[in-house]
Curated annotation (Swiss-Prot):
UniProt lineage: Bacteria, Pseudomonadati, Pseudomonadota, Gammaproteobacteria, Pseudomonadales
Name of the molecule in the record: 2,4-diacetylphloroglucinol hydrolase
Disruption phenotype: The phlA-phlG double mutant cannot degrade DAPG.
Entry cofactors: Zn(2+)
Organism of provenance: Pseudomonas protegens (strain DSM 19095 / LMG 27888 / CFBP 6595 / CHA0)
Field pH dependence: Activity is slightly enhanced at pH 6.6 and pH 6.0. Retains only 10% of its maximal activity at pH 7.6 and is inactive at pH 8.0.
Binding site for Zn(2+): H142, E173, H283, E287
Amino acid sequence: MAAICQFTPKDISMEARNMTPFTYFSLPMQKLFLRNQAAVRNKPYAKYFRSEMRVPLSAVRKIQQGPMALEDTLTPSIEDINRLLEPDFVSEESGYALLPGPMAYVQSRKFFPGCTAQMFKWWFIWHPAESERYTLWFPYAHVSNPCVHHQRLCDESLSFEERLYGNTFCASEYVGDRLMHLHIDFQQPASLGLNTDLYREAKIDGSVSALMSLADHPEVPVSLMVHLFKEVPDGMYLTSRYWVGAHPSMARFPGAEKAASLLKENGFGEAELETLAYEFAVHDMCEFNHLASFLPDLYREFGTPAA
């Protein structure tokens, strides 16, 4: 299914119906859920903290097939990331692989029923203000996600792009049983290599794409993350790609040449990066499909158009 084409209501309803509960979480994640549940109990939005997480059965089955063939993957090169904007590009809804480098690769496409681009933008403004808000997104995995320039993020005189791009979120979250502390530096699509003309022609409604680094080495980007969202009839699609590790094309980002040695020092060899790719694929599938299940209702209760 093309990432930027028009989807019919039939496409969306078929995909939305085939949801299944996701029930396996590592022991540290189960313990985190109980702590998060206690912390959110007295918040006005506590009813949106939900234990059941449902994901598309088709996405689960694709991940169960094991790593993708390399010919079906994309690299973080400028040429490859711009393929996401081509009218005939087909984006599968889930998958992972280990690329030469080594580099972990994750791909996904998620449908948000009844969601608009405005709702999705609002979420990125609203949730960093409190850790408890962040836990709604993935109750078993999310710890906190404060924003470095919070005052700018909340400045209603600025556009969404002015508030987010050039800003950094400091995420603490479990990916599998590994607690990760990450700096997520949101950037203009063009700064990451996405072609401005293609982006406009694709009629993308927004991007929350970023470079990621380990919190204790913020000067070394170890990951490129691309999230492009587009409204369709009855909802919104989010097309995502994650690259974590070393690749020659990452050299366009200052400091990335140190990523390979830094990751190796932190215990990320080829086997660990392949495991990370799998765990990130599961994490992405769970968190965004879970967000899709409650975001329209949350926005109607707490959202403001200015955000």
